[in-house]
């Protein structure tokens, strides 16, 4: 338990409020660069991965100077970021509302360090699951695992929702360059029957493997979709004994798994200390291991492990994810920014913003502190994004000339997996990556607009205020190790935010109420009687649905 109730009680928070009024509110990044030729060197860090690959994190275009950053670091120390971080890595129950450890970092403990939780070491248990995943994924990839007619598997369908879907979807898309030709992965998450129907309509039951991803094996959407998939399969296979060759479970509920018809040998478990939004590192990542191969999946884990060690051992003033989190707090709580933009200049990363939405907004979308009092300050930001250059032709107008401050992260790899046309496409992509962050910073003033020939009432329409903050993240190449490090960077950034706001970033009570009400309404939809048990709007909507349903 932190020693403070509210972040606003911290002495450094009050000092930062004064600093914002005296310096931050009028801070000019352009002027800061003009005054300090070494600003880029002072506010950028090169992260070195376990395989010697590198990622450059450039924070120099943000609205801070050294004094402000020093104050933010002091705030982190006062808030106990280091203490909470160390408690997480020690396996303590920092998820206080559910009395659980938060130990996803143990899932990528490839150095097999001692990482006990509740008096039990996790290293061997995690390694055993990974060995099982390797054996299974290798057998799918080499064709030795066959379906009920003796044919090799060509299509793997992961059925899950939330963290059991978003992580595997994002990672398989991001690492598609490492996939095996002829082996495809598909994902079903939405309870909308269209998602299941469209996914299955071109698949062959004889060569399809289903992975049912549900920790409890009772998640309503997942089990409904899984049952529909089983019925689709049995319509061709006929005999339920064939389920064993075509279904595996990523779950901890052996009783329900076996009752479904899945062989217990094809069940891959994980512990209660694995939160859904952090579960891609666990057995939930089996679809990833099958798609890109276990060695690449292991590199993915090791990349995350390397960022974990950086976060755990690096002083806060040079700690890359901590700095990212501190900047987020600075904009959110002192500038009043409500959103954060993430733009990957990489088509393979097109699902990365959606993945980060869950990580950030489910973790820090809280209004009660760990001291059980309501906050008197903003917490979780609204995170959004799309890949560039597409994004430049949609919402970048608002980012450049709108009335809202939208801090942004831009992500680019120097080396493309597809350097077509003598790398012309990648150089064009890179030129936009560099140009957008520069344009957001420098803007365009009235004099320059007039110098370019604009006159009269057109002039203000072509002005750009600039001074819009960006963080540029430049990797050498998007490899499994690089992606692992990038995800872990955002995990620990999110952790830092939550620690400063003194909220529990590891529960998600907000998703429960709607699910409970949906069960009640689901029963009401089973008959044709008009309902009158809700508010007038909900009654009206339900009754109109019943009238139009058939």
Curated annotation (Swiss-Prot):
- An example Gene Ontology CC term for this record: fungal biofilm matrix
Q: Which reaction does it catalyse?
A: alpha-D-glucose 6-phosphate = beta-D-fructose 6-phosphate
Q: What is its main location?
A: cytoplasm
Key word Repeat present: no
**Top-level taxonomic group:** Eukaryota
Q: Active site at which residues?
A: 362 (proton donor), 393, 515
Cellular localisation: Cytoplasm
Look up the record and name the pathway of this protein. Carbohydrate degradation; glycolysis; D-glyceraldehyde 3-phosphate and glycerone phosphate from D-glucose: step 2/4
**Residues reported to bind D-glucose 6-phosphate:** 163-164, 214-219, 358, 362, 393, 515
Residue stretches in coiled coil: none
The entry lists its GO molecular-function terms as:
carbohydrate derivative binding; glucose-6-phosphate isomerase activity; monosaccharide binding
InterPro entries linked to this entry: G6P_Isomerase, G6P_Isomerase_C, Phosphoglucose_isomerase_CS, SIS_dom_sf, SIS_PGI_1, SIS_PGI_2
This entry's Enzyme Commission designation comes to 5.3.1.9
Instruction: Fetch the SUPFAM superfamilies from UniProt.
Output: SIS domain
Keywords, comma-separated and alphabetical: Cytoplasm, Gluconeogenesis, Glycolysis, Isomerase
User: What GO terms in the biological process aspect are recorded for it?
Assistant: gluconeogenesis; glucose 6-phosphate metabolic process; glycolytic process
Report the protein's function. Answer: In the cytoplasm, catalyzes the conversion of glucose-6-phosphate to fructose-6-phosphate, the second step in glycolysis, and the reverse reaction during gluconeogenesis.
Its assembly, as annotated, is: Homodimer.
Q: Family per UniProt? A: Belongs to the GPI family.
Miscellaneous note, as given in the UniProt record, is:
Has antigenic properties. Elicits a specific immune response in systemic candidiasis human patients undergoing malignant hematological disorders.
Instruction: List the protein's name.
Output: Glucose-6-phosphate isomerase
